[in-house]
Amino acid sequence: MPDSLSFAHSAERNALRRELRARRRALPAAARIAGADALATRLFALPFFPAKGYVAGYWAMDGEIGLHSWQLRLPPGLVYCLPVLADDETLRFAPWRPGDELVTNRYGIPEPDVDPRASLTATDM
């Protein structure tokens, strides 16, 4: 039987998620684009930002801040990866570029159309 405290916490968390999604959706497109550009600028300014290898991002959904501005400006030696959910719920990563095929996973999230076993683990990144 679920613990009543954890159930209350879960209900509060779900309510907060709904509220934040509504706030994100209410932002005008210009504000979302400006936010994405500002985030990209800040990411590139990080002192530990890599020049080569892999970086993981996400497919922005439901008002989340987009990473496209950042992804399109990555240095040539840096490969952008999106999460791929394996059948065992393990999160893996696969290289992705605009135009590459995407499929919708069981949660409705677009991910690269690859066999999850052929994708990268977090430690491979």
Question: What residue ranges belong to the model's regions?
Answer:
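Short SAM/SAH-binding signature in class I
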Residues: T123-M125
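N-terminal active-site beta-alpha-beta segment that forms phosphate/nucleotide-binding
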Residues: P2-T121
